UniProtKB/Swiss-Prot annotation:
Bidirectionally degrades single-stranded DNA into large acid-insoluble oligonucleotides, which are then degraded further into small acid-soluble oligonucleotides. It is found in: Cytoplasm. InterPro entries: Exonuc_VII_L, Exonuc_VII_lsu_C, OB-fold_nuc-bd_dom. Heterooligomer composed of large and small subunits. The lineage of its organism: Bacteria, Pseudomonadati, Pseudomonadota, Gammaproteobacteria, Enterobacterales. Belongs to the XseA family. One of its GO terms (cellular component) is exodeoxyribonuclease VII complex. This is Exodeoxyribonuclease 7 large subunit. It comes from Salmonella heidelberg (strain SL476). Its main location: cytoplasm. Disulfide bonds: none annotated. Keywords: Cytoplasm, Exonuclease, Hydrolase, Nuclease. GO terms for molecular function: exodeoxyribonuclease VII activity; nucleic acid binding.
């Protein structure tokens, strides 16, 4: 029985050799993913380690001529992807793999590329604050570079329509995922700059995995954003997603919706500004009128205390100039208010808040009418008061009394003679008539009965 099986008997050496040949010929090169453990590098420069998963492990070797091409230093516990040949180490009969190339597995590779590019661009100064352009305030036209079918575009347009319906939006559609996406994004940025239609750009997309967002970690995209003459707001993924584009952009928004909030103005805020401007205008008019009224009162009191006709004429001239200046100032203010209201109305014309605008315009017209009537009434009242004051002062003027035939006599020391006992025979007195003075001597004094 033994003799019939003699041809099938293997020596240990032959067995190991046969198994090695079978493994190398049948398996060829394969890709293997696993976790590194027991990593060593002796003086020869070769790498020896174990690849394992939850239930199994295999010994690996990577010779110096191969590991020289690996761009990272393998670490214990690191997940890697290895391209290798399956073989058997004949002297010990150990099954092992000979690695030809190695790279971090899955997102580990992408994360490593991300960190390398981030460090490179940071060293070149592309992230420096001194290169950041300020955003226009307000924006007159917004450019959006994203997928025309993505949720990000819908969110951006929804926010812009709600906040600032009249703000023009230009969409530069592009792929945001896949091999062609970086090139398309770069061309869209360059096109927007060449056309010069908008003064701010939103570049972004909705959320996703690191692989989904990878187009915004592309060096070409980063350099295109940096070179853009139009300020760029990056809006990639969710708040926790940070891409290279975020570092290079002039401003990073946590989401596409937030980017739309940043570049737009609130329509309700514009209406509040109009109402505030109306209130300030009314207060300014009231203050101006009150100030002029006080000034007029002061002038009136001074005129009462200083009767001479020439000064009255000068004050009347000054008052007329003040009235004219006040009229010009009020007309200028009303004109400015009308111009401001017209500008605001033009900006809001496309937003169609017509009921509020009509009410605001009616209110302004009422204020203008009331203001004009108030000014006219005040001026008429002040003219009447001024005329009455002049008439009163003329009525009590000593000159008017003299004109009616009366005289005023004074002693030599200037005292007005009111009683007979102030003089005696022989005293000299001066008498004021309407057209001059006369000097006389008292001959006798006769008291009245």
């Amino acid at each position: 029985m033994l003799s019939s099986q003699t041809s099938s008997i293997f020596t240990v050496s032959r067995l190991n050799q046969t198994v090695r040949l079978l493994l190398e010929q049948e398996m060829g090169q394969v890709w293997i993913s696993g976790e590194i453990s027991n990593f060593t590098q002796p003086a020869s420069g070769h790498w020896y380690f174990t690849l394992k998963d939850d239930t199994a492990q295999v010994r690996c070797a990577m010779f110096r001529n191969s590991n020289r091409r690996v761009t990272f230093r393998p670490q214990h516990g690191q997940q890697v992807l290895v391209r290798a040949n399956i073989t058997l180490y004949e002297p010990r009969g150990d099954y092992q793999i000979i690695a030809e190339s190695m790279q971090p597995a899955g997102e580990g590779l992408l994360q490593q590329k991300y960190e390398q590019l981030k460090a490179k661009l940071h060293a070149e100064g592309l992230f420096d604050q001194q290169h950041k352009q300020p955003l226009p305030s307000p924006a007159h036209c917004v450019g959006v570079i994203t997928s025309k079918t993505g949720a990000a575009l819908h969110d951006i347009l929804h926010v812009l329509k709600r906040r600032d319906p009249s703000l023009p939006v230009i969409i530069y559609p592009t792929a945001v995922q896949g091999d062609d996406a970086p090139g398309q994004i770069v061309r869209a940025i360059e096109l927007a700059n060449a056309r010069g239609e908008c003064d701010v750009l939103i570049v972004g997309r909705g959320g996703g995995s690191l692989e989904d967002l990878w187009s915004f970690n592309d060096e070409r995209v980063a350099r295109a954003i940096f070179a853009s003459r139009i300020p760029v707001v990056s809006a990639v993924g969710h708040e926790t997603d940070v891409t290279i584009a975020d570092f290079v952009a002039d401003l990073r928004a946590p989401t596409p919706s937030a980017a739309a909030e940043i570049v737009s103005r609130n329509q309700q805020e514009l209406l509040r500004q109009i109402q505030s401007a109306q209130q300030r205008l009314g207060m300014a008019m009231d203050y101006y009128l009150a100030n002029r009224s006080r000034r007029f009162t002061q002038i009136f009191h001074r005129l009462q205390q200083q009767h001479p006709q020439l000064r009255l004429a000068r004050q009347q001239t000054a008052l007329e100039r003040l009235r004219q200046r006040m009229g010009f100032a009020l007309e200028a203010r009303i004109k400015q208010a009308n111009q401001r209201q017209q500008r605001v109305s033009q900006r809001l014309s496309q937003q169609n808040p017509q009921p509020r605008i009509h009410r605001a315009q009616s209110r302004i017209q009422q204020l203008e009418y009331r203001l004009t009537e108030n000014i006219r009434s005040r001026l008429s009242e002040q003219r009447e008061r001024f005329g009455n004051a002049v008439t009163h002062l003329e009525a009590v003027s000593p000159l008017a009394t003299l004109a009616r035939g009366y005289t005023v006599s004074t002693t030599t020391d200037g005292k007005v003679l009111k009683k007979i006992k102030q003089v005696k025979a022989g005293d000299i007195m001066t008498t004021r008539l309407e057209d001059g003075w006369l000097e006389s001597e008292v001959k006798s004094v006769t008291p009245g009965t």
